[in-house]
Every structure is written in C-alpha cells, then in structure tokens.
C-alpha cells in the first residue's frame, strides 16, 4: 500500500463521522491531481501536492476544539502540526512533511504563492469551495481572474461554472473562414487559385 493511500485512509479515519469534510478533501485531491498532471509538474512535486490535498484542512477540528470556530487563518495556524504528526506516523520523508506543512499553513493565503504545488492546491480548493458554498458566478469569475494561473484550473472553472463562454456555434469554422474571406476582399486582396 502506498504512503498516499495510507494517508487517504488515515484522513478518512481522522474525519470519521464528518462526511462533508471527507467529501471535501477527496474532491480537492481529485482536482489537484488532475491539474498537476495536466500541467506536467514533476513526480516529486505531484506527490507533495497530493499529500497536501488530503490534509489541507486538517486544522479544522483542532481549531473548533480550541476556539469554537474554524476560519481559514485558524486552519492555517492549527493544521501544520497535525499534518506533521500524521505524516511522521505514516513514514513520509521529512522534506515532504516540511513542504506539506508549509502548504497546509498557507492554503488560505493567496499572496506570494511560491510553487506549482501551492498554486494548484489553492485552485483545487477554490474549485470545490465554489460548488460547496454555492458561490455567485460573478464572485467565481473575479477570483478565477485574480488567483488562478494554470491553464487547466482556468479551463475547469470556466467549463464548470460558465460554460457559455466556451460554446461555439455548429458552423464556427465556416463562420471564421467567411469572416477571413470578407476581410481579404475588403482589403482589396485577391488570391489566385
């Protein structure tokens, strides 16, 4: 059994009785993995990204226990130690633990994003949160424009939440050629055939 699969199972155990949290990290992991693969990140970075996607919200339970709330900053504050403890128990390498802990401690901070693993984790979390929080289309468009950087993340957000921007007429190719012909004719250019 791979360490990532063990982490997956351990997180299900950690969040037992809380299907919303389990569903959330499973979806974030799925989007993160897809975006990472489509953006051709290296295997080690993908490994870190996948681990971080599983544990990114691990600070929610300790924040609720200590403070009675679980806002993003408290998740960032409480999550790294929990992630580190779990990952050490499962035998993850220290460099992986350190980077995952950093990502857990910053995944609600959208400035100074320093790496594709961080960028993709943020995008994957947003993709899931937009749906789970029933976000307004204008809010989604603004945040995608401001925060998303990967072609894959932008494409997924657009296709999922505002597909009308991707729809083409059935005659789009013919229409494009006709527009080109009209332009050429308007310029007085004649092409010999």
Model-identified regions with their sequence ranges:
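Active-site flanking loop/helix segments enriched in acidic
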Residues: 3-27, 59-70
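Divalent metal-dependent phosphate-bond-processing catalytic cores, especially two-metal-ion Mg2+/Mn2+ enzymes
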Residues: 13-26, 30-42, 55, 92, ...
């Amino acid at each position: 059994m791979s360490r990532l699969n063990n982490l997956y199972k351990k997180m299900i155990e950690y969040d037992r009785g809380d299907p919303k949290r389990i569903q959330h990290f499973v979806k974030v992991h799925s989007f993160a993995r897809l975006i990472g693969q489509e953006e051709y990140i290296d295997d080690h970075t993908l490994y870190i990204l996948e681990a971080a996607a599983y544990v990114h919200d691990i600070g929610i339970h300790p924040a609720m226990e200590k403070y009675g709330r679980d806002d993003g900053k408290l998740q960032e504050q409480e999550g790294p130690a929990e992630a580190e403890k779990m990952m050490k128990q499962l035998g993850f390498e220290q460099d992986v633990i350190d980077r995952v802990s950093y990502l857990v401690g910053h995944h609600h901070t959208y400035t100074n994003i320093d790496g594709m693993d961080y960028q993709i984790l943020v995008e994957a979390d947003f993709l899931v949160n937009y749906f789970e929080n029933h976000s307004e289309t204008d809010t989604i468009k603004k945040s995608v424009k401001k925060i998303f950087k990967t072609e894959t993340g932008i494409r997924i957000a657009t296709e999922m939440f505002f597909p009308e921007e991707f729809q083409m007429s059935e005659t789009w190719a013919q229409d494009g050629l006709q527009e080109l012909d009209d332009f050429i004719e308007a310029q007085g250019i004649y092409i010999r055939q």
